[in-house]
Amino acid sequence: MPPRGLELLIAQTILQGFDAQYGRFLEITAGAQHRFEQADWHAVQQAMKSRIHLYDHHVGLVVEQLRCIMEGKATDPDFLLRVKRHYTDLLPDYPRFEIAESFFNSVYCRLYDHRSLTPDRLFIFSSQPERRFRTMPRPLAKNFFPEQGWQPLLTTLLTDLPLRLPWQDLARDVRYIIAHLNETLGPARLAQAHLEMANELFYRNKAAWLVGKLRLPDATLPFLLPVHRSDDGELFVDTCLTGSAGASIVFGFARSYFMVYAPLPAALVEWLREILPGKTTAELYMAIGCQKHAKTESYREYLHYLRHADEQFIEAPGIRGMVMLVFTLPGFDRVFKVIKDRFAPQKEMSEAHVRACYQLVKEHDRVGRMADTQEFENFVIEKRRISPELMALLQQEVGQKLTDMGDKISISHLYIERRMVPLNIWLEQATGQQLRDAIEEYGNAIRQLAAANIFPGDMLFKNFGVTRHGRVVFYDYDEICYMTEVNFRDIPPPRYPEDELSAEPWYSVAPGDVFPEEFRHWLCADPKIGPLFEEMHSDLFSASYWRALQTRIREGYVEDVYAYRRRQRFCVRWKNHNGHPEAAVSAIAPSAVGEG
């Protein structure tokens, strides 16, 4: 085959491989409605894992094909550049060009073991950056105007959903939504508003989300409705979210990816950007399940920051870890985590174990309590960007992962993660209600992780962070395990009075044994924290609490986990109004509810 024909064949093979991958991605995503209708929550969890694995699987298939057809050209740099040019020529009219570029990068990295990662060989920057703002041909959303009032508008919106289940009480849910809108906006502003709703539902866990925009003359607000399925197979709306902070949490970096049918992901990302202005492009792609392209965008955001900030990398604030070396740029919103060459003596584990823990988190339901990460190999940093103190620490702690490249160093493996304030630092500075909220959040994080079959292992405050919305998120994964793998035990009574004074336990301790009573020693040691913890979370110190959760997990029960406060649920917010919340909201205008 002539060289130019071979180069084109390779480019076409890579793009065809991506087509196959994204086709399967959409196929799994399209099954979300059926899984929701059938309440097959275990299938929901399996589909999430399968969709994540798809990408690497198809990259591997393409790499095997290319190794068979490259005819020894793999080491010819000019040949590789021509392949990329051919691939670029295939993309101008390609609907998912931006993710196809990331797929090319992944194939290249797999073929060449993450070496020679330069802009001429990879799509480190997009070949068509202007296309993401182009009007897409397929309408993503539909407008709803309250010409006859909000009651018929919302009734139409909900009854037109593709879900093939009856409503528990549609009129009640419509009243709830209208009451929330009146309470939030007031009747006068609501009368001037209309909705723009995404055509596709956003599925995650046990909810199907309607995602839309509440358009007002002077503003555009998020409009989010989580639809749930009752145990009797009936639909109900659990709440209505119209605040930017609430929407940001729903699409947060600590949550599992949505299943939303998006044949044109760039168009959906641009549409979402208006109601999620605090989210980066990487975070938006991550939220809709395009996590590998989100990694590309995350790296581009990092490069953009470097171009516009003259800062040096420093060790991240907080207590130094026993397994990870963590560093950051002072003004950047992410941290860089490198597994140390040697762990502290009490950490009896291997690097392979740590990597497996991070992969577990990637694939598991993170329930809003575990930060997502992007994994990089051969990550290059200019030496001038590294503070002398950090350089010394890198050489001391992760020297085996460093390669000297003259004016740069390469780190063979690291994770990038969203930066948070370490909880121990937050608690040192918090007072009053802020302290109380943080302790409540910490306990809720532990409970929700446990309900999702995750035991953090090391529950010290330093292993948790606080987000900009005040949520507590777990981020130290080296001791993480499934709840069902742990043996929760009560401490046996002492045999003799002197047993309690002994430095050694008077009872046997096997691998996997955990004694929740011991949590009290380090979680309640601070006198300003202890009473709050005892008040709100004392059951966490009881082995019976943990064993009861294990029983539910083993029986196959999947807990409900909400992306909003319990008090925001309609059934809690208006539980004393018998489905008629308008009694709690003053001056609901007839025009607003369509009754005048």
Swiss-Prot record:
Enzymatic reactions: L-seryl-[isocitrate dehydrogenase] + ATP = O-phospho-L-seryl-[isocitrate dehydrogenase] + ADP + H(+)
Subcellular localization: Cytoplasm
Catalytic residues (UniProt): 372
Keyword rRNA-binding listed: no
Gene Ontology molecular function, alphabetical: [isocitrate dehydrogenase (NADP+)] kinase activity; AMP binding; ATP binding; phosphoprotein phosphatase activity; protein serine/threonine kinase activity
UniProt-annotated binding residues for ATP: 316-322, 337
Top-level taxon: Bacteria
Cellular component aspect of the GO annotation: cytoplasm
InterPro entries assigned to the protein according to its UniProt record, in alphabetical order: AceK_kinase (IPR046855), AceK_regulatory (IPR046854), Isocitrate_DH_AceK (IPR010452)
Disulfide bonds: none
EC number of the protein: 2.7.11.5, 3.1.3.-
A UniProt-annotated Pfam family: AceK_regulatory
Alphabetic keyword roster: ATP-binding, Cytoplasm, Glyoxylate bypass, Hydrolase, Kinase, Nucleotide-binding, Protein phosphatase, Serine/threonine-protein kinase, Transferase, Tricarboxylic acid cycle
Protein's UniProt keywords contain Nucleotide-binding: yes
Biological process according to GO: glucose metabolic process; glyoxylate cycle; tricarboxylic acid cycle
Summary of the function given for this chain in its UniProt record: Bifunctional enzyme which can phosphorylate or dephosphorylate isocitrate dehydrogenase (IDH) on a specific serine residue. This is a regulatory mechanism which enables bacteria to bypass the Krebs cycle via the glyoxylate shunt in response to the source of carbon. When bacteria are grown on glucose, IDH is fully active and unphosphorylated, but when grown on acetate or ethanol, the activity of IDH declines drastically concomitant with its phosphorylation.
Family that this chain belongs to: Belongs to the AceK family.
Name of the protein in its database record: Isocitrate dehydrogenase kinase/phosphatase
